[in-house]
Regions:
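Macrodomain-like recognition of ADP-ribose-binding/processing modules
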Residues: 1-114
Length: 114
C-alpha cells in the first residue's frame, strides 16, 4: 500500500485519512492539533473523540491509534496516534513514537485508506 507523508498544513490536505499526534485523553493539544480541530469543527471533533474513547476502551495507551470522522476536513478520517511526551529520549520515546505511527498505518490499511 502506498502512503504519502506531508510536511505542510495537513488541515488542507485531501486524503482518506490524516494522522494526528494525540494524547491519551484524546484532547486537543497545540500546533497541528489546534489547526485540525479548528478546520474539522471543534465541537464535532471533541464529541467524536469522547465517543471513540468510550467505544474502544476507557484507557488509551501510548503507541495505539484511534479513528474518528474528519468532519469539515477534506479527508474521511482522522487517525489519532497516541504519542509520548518527549522526556529527553531516555524513556523509550523513540520506540513508543514508532509504535504509534505503525499502529496508525496498520489502522489505515484495515480501513482501506489509500
Amino acid at each position: 500500500m502506498q502512503y504519502k507523508i506531508v510536511r505542510n498544513d495537513i488541515s488542507i490536505v485531501k486524503a482518506d485519512a490524516i494522522v494526528l499526534p494525540a494524547n491519551t485523553m484524546l484532547r486537543e493539544g497545540s500546533g497541528t492539533s489546534t489547526a485540525l480541530y479548528e478546520k474539522a469543527g471543534r465541537a464535532e471533533l471533541e464529541k467524536a473523540c469522547k465517543e471513540a474513547k468510550k467505544r474502544y476502551k476507557k484507557q488509551l495507551y501510548i503507541g495505539e491509534a484511534i479513528p474518528t470522522l474528519a468532519f469539515n476536513l477534506d479527508a474521511d478520517y482522522i487517525i489519532h496516534a497516541i504519542v509520548p511526551k518527549w522526556k529527553g529520549g531516555h524513556n523509550h520515546e523513540y520506540e513508543l513514537l514508532s509504535s504509534a505511527y505503525y499502529s496508525s498505518l496498520k489502522l489505515a490499511d484495515m480501513m482501506s485508506c489509500k
